[in-house]
Amino acid sequence: MTIHQIHTKQPISINNDPWEAYTDIETHNKLTLSNIEFTTTNLCNMRCSHCAVGYTLQTQDPDPLPMDIIYRRLDEIPDLKTMSITGGEPMFSKKSIKQVVKPLLKYAYDRGIYVQMNSNLTLPQDRYLDIAEYIDVMHISHNWGTLDEFATVGFGAMEKQPPLKAKLKLYDQMLNNAQTLSDQGMFISAETMLNQSTLPYLTKIHNEIVKDMKCSRHEIHPMYPADFASDLNVLSLKEMKQAIHQLLDMRDENTWMLFGTLPIYPC
């Protein structure tokens, strides 16, 4: 593993989002390989109906690649500035955390690379606090207009359902973890999909994300037809526009709102 000089990173803000590809054009005058995403585990304690990998998750992880190989290949990417860590649920397996997640986080920290982790934030709080200093963005999905929605959609792809009490405990833990981590300075970005399930509850969802969970950013992404989300209904273009107008009219103006993959504009 190459020893890299530790760089001082500027805080994530609406004026500094290193995951935006256009900044590569500004810096290098061309698109370049600047972001790598690692799937560190195929395990998860939930099975969300909207999850792109929810139907492919496993009950046992294969052996990971040796970290020496990963370090060597990362060293070959001179313009690497961001890293995304996802799963499954990256904080579910203690073995994976020790063998893969923490080594990746420490590598990124030493090299001055920004790190985003995709998590459901439902696991014991000490796991998140243990890695907090290495995380630039904690990304979560929050599409829950009601507790029933969390209990059904959040476990929609799970064959053997846990008891309702256990599901609701995870919901409370997610809210508490988000609030605590936000209070301690972690940048949490909560993503909400626009579909028929979230449409009636957009105001409630936004207020919960901003006021209860104290997230730094609320991402809005339209849901498009996909095999993995076939149980969820998409919005018409008219409904989508109305939903966006509703969010813009009632949003907390001190909170960063990020709208992505809108069908109204070309990518």
Residue ranges, per PLM feature:
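Aromatic/hydrophobic pocket-lining residues that form the small-molecule binding cavity
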Residues: 66-70, 97, 101, 128, ...
